[in-house]
Amino acid sequence: MNGVIIVNILRKTLSSLAIVGLGFAMANSAVAEEKAMATHQQAQQLQQPAPETAAKRAPTKEELTPVNPNLKIEAANEKFAADFPRQYNSWAKTAEQTEFHKEVEDDPRMIVMWGGYAFAKEFNSPRGHIYAVTDVRNILRTGSPKDANGGPQPMACWTCKGPDVPRLIAEWGEEGYFSGKWAKGGAEVVNSIGCADCHDTQSQDFKDGKPALRVARPHVLRALDTVGKTFATSDRTDQRAGVCANCHVEYYFDKSTGANNVVFPWYKGRDVDSIEKYYDEIGFKDWEHSISKAPMLKAQHPDFETWSMGTHGKNGVTCVDCHMAKTQDKDGKVYTDHQVVGNPVKDNFQNTCARCHDQSQDTLIKTVEQHKADVREVMLKLEDQLVKSHFEAKTAWDNGATQEEMKDALQAIRHAQWRWDFAAASHGMHMHAPDVALKIIASGLDRVADARAKLAVILAKHGVQQPIQYPDISTAEKAWKVMGIDIEKERKEKEEFIKTVIPEWNKEAISKGLILTAPPTTPAK
């Protein structure tokens, strides 16, 4: 039983570390409290789920939105350049945001944690909006399909990438859009995140220079309905946050209608525990882990959810206020900057933070960096324990463990990694809600300790000497090999795909008039 003793000591140590970090973050998170905005109550309402009696589950086939020939969407961003030069030119500057981090190469633990899932091959931090189509084409996760029916991913993987998506849903209906493989949309989804994703570009208000904000993706409107909101009648604060919720949210692919429909799991709430409860009740899993056999969940990018739990969300400060702040051109005309500044504290302080905060830029930069370091420290501790839990589960299976013996330990792994992923996939959670991030990670540490304690008992029962020997995953190359991923083969196939298939997609899209020029090919730095 030595394994149980070791793991229980570890549990106490890691939980203490998480609590210390949590206390520090909570002390620093008060910087904006004195400047609470008048929209506090409205923002609070946005966080609340609809009454239980109003809640429902994923839509049935009959409830999916049909073809809508009356909904006209001009997806080509370039066509708005002449009428809206300031907004368009600032949006085009997202092309300057070429840098991203190759996350799984920087942190090979992820390769193990995502074993059996495409994220183990490649996962990168985000860059400029203009690269959304380019990056989903180039990433190893989407494979190298040779025709419209090939490849590993469904059509739904295009859903956040640009305004061609609502155009296609209007033309094909939801069932038609969400059916089939990702490659089906290769010559159709060609305009990256842009104008018609957020604006009703055909309306008179838009032509008159008003924002005319709109959500044109039916699954997003259904999700807002679950929290008691109707986009069209919502106030400006809710709408400004709601358009970002087109994409910056947690979602899953529901297959009950025969397609891969995008659904937001908000039926019990939008916090990590409520979403987990929903997934558990419907028996959903994103995949089965390749070595531990745990039924895993993959958080997407729950920025909207985590923002709503933080100081800014609670006080009605929206994504647009910080990342797309008002600015002036050389003639003094005020407009919304569409460059989408990733780090406004460093890169746009006077137009954002300084409008509410009395602290200096240096002070706030140090505060945010400390939050990030605190979250990162405990997150890596959780990753270390998750990696060990997956290998320990594999060892238990290899030594004759049964499904009945393993089910509780595997469920604990599922819940622990879900919490890690919820915090990790929301790239700015250290800024949006650092105290919430640390609470989530601390609860993940508790659950992985529970998993490892259960596994220690199972391993001892089957005569396994503990601690077990863990493989060397100190580099991405070593981790890929341990997890059975032939990364060079994947890369060569993708290179051929980029060279041969993508030019044909671009050629077809241009011939149809869907784009004027092909999506950018600037490589990431």
UniProtKB/Swiss-Prot annotation:
Positions that bind heme c 5: H312, C353, C356, H357
One annotated Gene Ontology cellular component of this protein: outer membrane-bounded periplasmic space
Cofactor: Ca(2+); heme c
Residue positions binding heme c 4: C319, C322, H323, H432
InterPro entries assigned to the protein according to its UniProt record, in alphabetical order: Cyt_c552, Cyt_c_NO2Rdtase_formate-dep, Multihaem_cyt_sf
CDD domains in UniProt: NrfA-like
Residues that, per the record, bind heme: C157, C160, K161
Residue ranges of the region described as Disordered: 43-63
Function: Catalyzes the reduction of nitrite to ammonia, consuming six electrons in the process.
The protein's name in its UniProt record: Cytochrome c-552
Species of origin: Mannheimia succiniciproducens (strain KCTC 0769BP / MBEL55E)
Lineage: Bacteria, Pseudomonadati, Pseudomonadota, Gammaproteobacteria, Pasteurellales
